[in-house]
Amino acid sequence: MGKKINPILFRLKKNTVYHSLWYTFKKNFCYYLKCDILIREIIRRNFLFINLSYIDIIISNKLTINLYINNVDQFNIIENYLDVFVFQISKILKKNVILNFVFNHVLNAKNIAYNVVNQILNKNSIKKIIKEELLKNRKNFGCKIQISGRLEGVDIARKEWSLIGRIPLHTIKYNLEYYQCETLTQYGILGVKIWLFKKNNEK
């Protein structure tokens, strides 16, 4: 069971939190779900060049959006585009928008995936990429990186993965992060999956 289900979904009520929080009636659930997906798509499209760790969307009488970034320099890049972005978002729900930036310096699974994808696009060796990223994250209890597809242009798709430490997929109480993404190369699409076993007090 633990190996089939998404590790974040498996631990949602135990030690993880929802990144979408809506204060509304049950009949408006479908409408707010569509708005939530649309807002996240606009955020990704506008801030494509920035590595956002998390996106929190809180809908009440106002719309509150918390963007978690890892570097203060990233905020300086997007500072000039914030007015246009807030205007686009306010037209969707017709609510006042509160935009908060949270500087999150703790490395998470999405940051690792972002680094792996950048190195793949730079045409580095797959085994070298995995080895370097695992060595960077050896302070955690465990880290597993898997890359699948036509690796380095081979004719038959395969998986390349490596693990340092341990990844307890079946134990719900542990703080386990998971992230998956895809990247387009000249040989096709490569899938990247990251499992990260962190200390319980880290977010």
From Swiss-Prot:
SUPFAM superfamilies: Prokaryotic type KH domain (KH-domain type II), Ribosomal protein S3 C-terminal domain. Disulfide bonds: none annotated. Keywords: Ribonucleoprotein, Ribosomal protein. It comes from the Bacteria. GO terms for molecular function: mRNA binding; structural constituent of ribosome. PROSITE patterns: RIBOSOMAL_S3. GO terms for cellular component: cytosolic small ribosomal subunit. Pfam families: Ribosomal_S3_C. InterPro entries: KH_sf_prok-type (IPR009019), Ribosomal_S3_C_sf (IPR036419), Ribosomal_uS3_bac-typ (IPR005704), Ribosomal_uS3_C (IPR001351), Ribosomal_uS3_CS (IPR018280). GO terms for biological process: translation. Binds the lower part of the 30S subunit head. Binds mRNA in the 70S ribosome, positioning it for translation. Belongs to the universal ribosomal protein uS3 family. Part of the 30S ribosomal subunit. Forms a tight complex with proteins S10 and S14. This is Small ribosomal subunit protein uS3. The lineage of its organism: Bacteria, Pseudomonadati, Pseudomonadota, Gammaproteobacteria, Oceanospirillales.
